[in-house]
């Protein structure tokens, strides 16, 4: 499974993104769990960890942007903040594409840990 949601620290929801999105079913699993959080009608925050994330087909940038657009149409936004830990430039650039196409639902801190150059960059969107 591409996205593993951990609700143990709710309202902080940790999402471990591992491997690749093998098919649309993997992507729908990721978005359906997000929608289930909205159905609870309680505020929450995301912490995404992409350390084990593989190469993702860029088409999922568009799918994610369209999903964000759909979420933004909700009358009440329960997502209050996200932190995304990124460890490679490829994933970092995919995120930039997503948020260029569609602005995020809530403030996001992207923490890019460049393991090759031993540096950390924080970008707030």
Residue positions per predicted region:
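Amphipathic, Lys/Arg-enriched alpha-helical "gate/interface" segment within cytosolic domains
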Residues: 1-125
């Amino acid at each position: 499974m591409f996205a593993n949601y951990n609700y143990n620290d709710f309202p902080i929801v940790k999402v471990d993104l591992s491997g690749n999105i093998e098919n649309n079913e993997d992507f729908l699993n990721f978005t359906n769990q997000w929608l289930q959080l909205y159905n609870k009608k309680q505020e929450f925050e995301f912490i995404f960890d992409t350390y084990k994330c593989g190469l993702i087909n860029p088409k999922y940038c568009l799918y994610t942007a369209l999903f964000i657009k759909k979420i933004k149409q909700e009358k009440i936004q329960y997502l209050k903040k996200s932190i995304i830990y990124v460890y490679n430039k490829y994933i970092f650039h995919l995120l930039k594409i997503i948020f260029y196409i569609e602005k995020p639902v809530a403030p996001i801190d992207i923490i890019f840990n460049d393991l090759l150059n031993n540096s950390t960059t924080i970008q707030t969107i």
